[in-house]
């Protein structure tokens, strides 16, 4: 689990994520769609796969990931009952995000792993 220190670091890093959300989000989505093309079906409301479309939607996705830093203690309930995030595809997205962000934000590996665990725990 995330320690109090981890949570503090994660919340601090959110500013960097938000500042670069469109660029990093677009790169992450492009990587996700290239490595796991079937994940496009989970983006049914998103049909603009142009560079600009990915940039804008990638920004929304990455900002949504940043938003969960305010809910680190109840991720499973939030995502399982309110946001309805598919727990099976989040690890694929988190891997794409990690590859994109690893050079800049190393602490996110642990954070994204905890998000994936929290999402999965709600469905057991």
Curated annotation (Swiss-Prot):
Red blood cells (at protein level). Signal peptide: none annotated. Heme b binds at residue 79. GO terms for cellular component: blood microparticle; haptoglobin-hemoglobin complex; hemoglobin complex. SUPFAM superfamilies: Globin-like. Residues 1-124 form the Globin domain. Involved in oxygen transport from gills to the various peripheral tissues. Belongs to the globin family. This is Hemoglobin subunit alpha.
């Amino acid at each position: 689990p995330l320690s109090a220190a981890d949570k503090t670091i994660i919340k601090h890093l959110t500013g960097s994520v938000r500042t670069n959300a469109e660029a990093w989000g677009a790169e992450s989505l492009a990587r996700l769609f290239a490595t796991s093309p079937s994940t496009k079906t989970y983006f049914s409301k998103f049909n603009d796969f142009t560079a600009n479309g990915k940039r804008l939607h990638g920004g929304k996705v990455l900002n949504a990931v940043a938003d969960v830093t305010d809910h680190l203690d109840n991720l499973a309930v939030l995502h399982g009952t309110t946001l309805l995030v598919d727990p099976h595809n989040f690890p694929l997205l988190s891997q794409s995000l990690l590859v994109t962000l690893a050079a800049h934000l190393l602490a996110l590996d642990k954070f994204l792993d905890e998000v994936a665990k929290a999402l999965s725990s709600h469905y057991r």
